[in-house]
């Protein structure tokens, strides 16, 4: 199933990481979406996660101010920091949705490579 939201703006996109600003089609709540692919070098089974975190007004303003346009890879840690603040909705590699607690989402791992 798909979630009722629209991507309003790309903040960073690559083949293994992506961040987008989104908006709920029903209520207009802004969300920060984060995609991360963990590469399975040994078995080729890449694990892909997508996570969404609702944004409050000051966070949306801060992101809009700090990211007036899409930026490069150096922006990943700056955008990742938002996901440690509150629970996030996660779509895991098993195509299952669940809410995670702050700090335990696999997407919070540091950038490597």
Name what the model sees in each region.
Residues 24-27:
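Short Cys/His-rich metal-coordination motifs, predominantly Zn2+-binding knuckles/fingers
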Residues 1-21, 32-61:
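Short recognition patches in nucleic-acid-associated and regulatory proteins
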